[in-house]
UniProtKB/Swiss-Prot annotation:
Belongs to the non-flavoprotein flavin reductase family. RutF subfamily. One of its GO terms (molecular function) is FMN binding. It holds the Pfam family Flavin_Reduct. NCBIfam families: RutF. It comes from the Bacteria. HAMAP family: RutF. This is FMN reductase (NADH) RutF. It comes from Enterobacter cloacae subsp. cloacae (strain ATCC 13047 / DSM 30054 / NBRC 13535 / NCTC 10005 / WDCM 00083 / NCDC 279-56).
Amino acid sequence: MTTPDKQTFRDAMACVGAAVNIITTDGPAGRAGFTASAVCSVTDSPPTLLVCLNRGASVWPTFSENRTLCVNTLSAGQEPLSNLFGGKTPMEDRFAAARWQTGETGCPRLEEALASFDCRISQVVSVGTHDILFCDIVSIIRHPAPQGLVWFDRGYHALMRPAC
């Protein structure tokens, strides 16, 4: 059996839908943010999630030094904000495009996020090109947006809440 090549892996991963998130930080190393879909729950006791971050990303040193982050899960209609944080736009312009509050850790929390998870990075594991950031959740804020946003098949898709 042969190991799948990089393109085959990427094409298969495009079939795996995931929530769209903006990951933010602020602290001694400065303020930064990026768009990520590589985010998932680890355990609820204690509440912990993980975020994958490429060590070659321009924001990596900032997150690495600050050791705090906020996972802001986007709702439908926030695609332009996702694109802004996913590109090469200067940080100041990224943050100017939305309304933010400050979370308990000092990280920016998106006011209109579907959910915001304010976290402290408790452990970092390096695998290949990425660091897996294990994050202890300090606080959670939810917003009653009617639709979620997922990335699937290399595009955005809205998810409706089920009717009760």
